[in-house]
Amino acid sequence: MGSEGPTPWPSYVNNDLRQDHGSEHIDYVTIHVWPQNWGWFDPAASKGSAKDLEHAWKASVAYIDAAVAVAASLTKPLVVEEFVLARDNGRSTGGSTSQRDAFYTKMCSYLAAKPGTVAGLNFWAWAGEGRPRDMAAERVIWAPGDAWTGDPPHEPQGWYSVYAEDATTHSVFAQCVSSFSLHDEG
């Protein structure tokens, strides 16, 4: 079982983090962190201003900290099972990943600093060699026969994709894995 967590609209999605994870048969608490989908950051509108990215970060931290408190009260670890930020300027294809890399770096560092409380995290989403069918288009919705890019069919393909050649993002992940592996060493 996975849970997005309360999201900014818990009554809309009918999520209650404590109730959803309170069962003795659930071993850990899960949340998602989606600043763009939740209206905390619009890389296209802001052109990725540092101020707007910082707002997204602060909103994410407040959201995570609230989930950490619930997880601690349930004596269960927290897993951020999905966290994401689009490519710079909201591009689905091409474009740099400097904003996303900065956000991911902060996310990994912040969560790794909470051993015993935060057990892990997963980014969204691996596309590898997959690409939207029209690389020149701003937004391409999946259709049968299209490559899988990690994004669900109803969302723009490549929106949140990490491609095989996104070397700087891969470096962020390598550092993140290293930070979390320290948890195992006590």
Question: In which residue ranges do the predicted regions lie?
Answer:
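Extracellular glycoside hydrolase catalytic/binding regions
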Residues: 1-117
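Aromatic-rich peripheral "rim/lid" segments of glycoside hydrolase catalytic domains that contact
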Residues: 18-25, 59, 91-106, 110-186
